[in-house]
């Protein structure tokens, strides 16, 4: 969850209702309280990312997400990975669900995002994700008790 107070921890309860049936449950910021320009950038970036990943996720930037630990442990980490969390979870043959959550105007801090790091860098990261997806090996390490 972000520290800018644009979402509320209370909405985690909405996500937790479905975590038994899905490996990732994530929020979609309903009625976003951001500027027109920020919302436009987000729609463009999410649309392109969705086209490249085919994950169907509307709002990957929503900070409210809950996921199973076993899946979280298998995520490859890299700069900008947060944009691809749903796609990386889907590579593990998981199921995801998106749920509308509340969104509030920013009351604290300033955004660290601007045109360059909201559009250009994620654009390039999409190609890196596609490269990685072609080479991804979905595996699980089983428990093996050698000492009984």
Where are these regions (language model features)?
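A secondary-structure boundary/capping signal
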Residues: 1, 27-28, 67-68, 100
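The conserved acidic donor/metal-binding loop of glycosyltransferases
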Residues: 2-6
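GHKL-family ATP-binding catalytic core of two-component histidine kinases
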Residues: 8-9, 68
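Conserved donor NDP-sugar-binding/catalytic core segment of glycosyltransferases
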Residues: 11-36
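Hydrophobic helical membrane-anchoring modules
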Residues: 14-17, 47, 54-55, 78-148
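A short acidic, helix-capping loop that chelates divalent metal ions and anchors anionic groups
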Residues: 33-35, 71, 105-110
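A conserved catalytic-core signature of glycosyltransferases
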Residues: 35, 39, 43, 59-62, ...
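Conserved nucleotide-sugar donor-binding
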Residues: 46-51, 62-75
